[in-house]
């Protein structure tokens, strides 16, 4: 199993965010967000940077962060059922069907495994689907997450809206 540098740093007790690369984070500086570990904060920055690149505003940011919190706890998941996912950096093995990455995107639907295992690319996949939802800019964020993900537990998204809002606001959304 591969571990990211952030997880190793966190396990050693150092301040993980300070040593993280910022290339996936656009113009967002390394920092910790609302009850997130350094590793989770790194992934949150990647999602938020993609939301900024796509000009999705607070609504897009909150939907992306809330979804990743629910689906993966903002931890990169590979899956033994998707052997190709094991070739990329991951932090945890998942076992939900053929779901991988931060958004638990189904490999049978999102066939570019490399993309699903990459923070910016997987966020783009999520946002691309999100933008097809009619009136996505105006609906409640939890409902928007459900419209994109089609979860068996749609109520879970609402549980993370406040945290997602705090994280996005701290990043300037």
Cite the ranges covered by each PLM segment.
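Extracytoplasmic/secreted envelope proteins and their assembly/folding machinery
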Residues: 41-48, 61-64, 102, 120-127, ...
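Acidic helix/loop microenvironments that form the catalytic cleft of cell-wall polysaccharide enzymes
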Residues: 68-72, 137-159
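Intrinsically disordered, low-complexity
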Residues: 20-42, 157-173
């Amino acid at each position: 199993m591969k571990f990211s540098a952030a997880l190793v740093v966190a396990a050693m007790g150092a301040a993980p965010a300070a040593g993280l690369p910022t290339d996936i984070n656009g113009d967002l500086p390394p920092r910790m967000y609302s009850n997130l570990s350094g590793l989770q904060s790194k992934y949150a920055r990647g999602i938020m940077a993609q939301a900024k690149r796509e000009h999705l505003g607070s609504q897009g940011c909150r939907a992306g962060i809330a979804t990743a919190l629910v689906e993966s706890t903002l931890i990169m998941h590979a899956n033994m059922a998707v052997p190709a996912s094991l070739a990329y950096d991951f932090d945890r093995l998942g076992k939900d069907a053929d779901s991988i990455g931060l958004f638990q995107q189904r490999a049978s639907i999102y066939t570019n495994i490399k993309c699903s295992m990459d923070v910016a690319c997987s966020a783009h996949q999520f946002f691309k689907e999100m933008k097809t939802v009619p009136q996505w800019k105006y609906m409640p964020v939890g409902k928007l997450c459900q419209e994109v993900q089609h979860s068996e537990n749609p109520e879970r998204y609402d549980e993370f809206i406040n945290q997602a809002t705090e994280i996005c606001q701290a990043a300037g959304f």
